[in-house]
Amino acid sequence: MSKEEFPSEKDLPQEDQEKQAKAAEADKAGVKDDKKVKDDKEEAAKPADVELDQLKAEVAALTQKNKDLEDKYLRSQAEIQNAQRRYSKERADLVKYESQRLGKDILSSVDNLERALQVKADDEASRQLKKGIEMTLEGLVRALKDNGIEEIKADGEKFDPTLHQAVQSVPAENDDQKGHVVQVLQKGYVYKDRTLRPAMVVVAQ
């Protein structure tokens, strides 16, 4: 086919040349518009990504804060429960051992009365006085027992460091006597399940 069959732009009429030029410009504009849309989308996506990262960071911070608050709450609850248990125990002990201090004060009077009874009564007046002391002592011992204070068994018993205080040791007369109390120098007392005063004893070794 010869060149005459395909006319160049110069050979086209002026009107057709203008149409082709406009079409070319439109194509270029379309490409630019597509690129602009793409760029706009990318720019719009960037703030969204930043905002998402910020939200994630805030959620993580709030989650940690909530965990810290929950831990503090649990610790506070545990401290409150421990305080309540201590308070309950102290009250129970106070009720249970309310006579302990009074018992200790009375024991010194019991010791004095027992020493007074060891004095020999030579006349009727002394015997009457001794009888009165015996009655007083019996009343005190009975009152102590009624309030949970009782004498510790010591003479002839196996030495028990929770109940007895060894102040002296002597040679044992036989093997069975070893480690046993052979003399009580001062009586000991227990108050319910507590040792109010250990017995002062001599132990055979």
From Swiss-Prot:
Residues 1-49 are annotated as: Disordered. SUPFAM superfamilies: Coiled-coil domain of nucleotide exchange factor GrpE, Head domain of nucleotide exchange factor GrpE. One of its GO terms (biological process) is protein folding. Homodimer. This is Protein GrpE. GO terms for cellular component: cytoplasm. Pfam families: GrpE (PF01025). Belongs to the GrpE family. It is found in: Cytoplasm. Gene3D superfamilies: 3.90.20.20, Head domain of nucleotide exchange factor GrpE (2.30.22.10). CDD domains: GrpE. Keywords: Chaperone, Cytoplasm, Stress response. GO terms for molecular function: adenyl-nucleotide exchange factor activity; protein homodimerization activity; protein-folding chaperone binding; unfolded protein binding. Participates actively in the response to hyperosmotic and heat shock by preventing the aggregation of stress-denatured proteins, in association with DnaK and GrpE. It is the nucleotide exchange factor for DnaK and may function as a thermosensor. Unfolded proteins bind initially to DnaJ; upon interaction with the DnaJ-bound protein, DnaK hydrolyzes its bound ATP, resulting in the formation of a stable complex. GrpE releases ADP from DnaK; ATP binding to DnaK triggers the release of the substrate protein, thus completing the reaction cycle. InterPro entries: GrpE (IPR000740), GrpE_coiled_coil (IPR013805), GrpE_head (IPR009012). PANTHER family: GRPE PROTEIN (PTHR21237), GRPE PROTEIN HOMOLOG, MITOCHONDRIAL (PTHR21237:SF23).
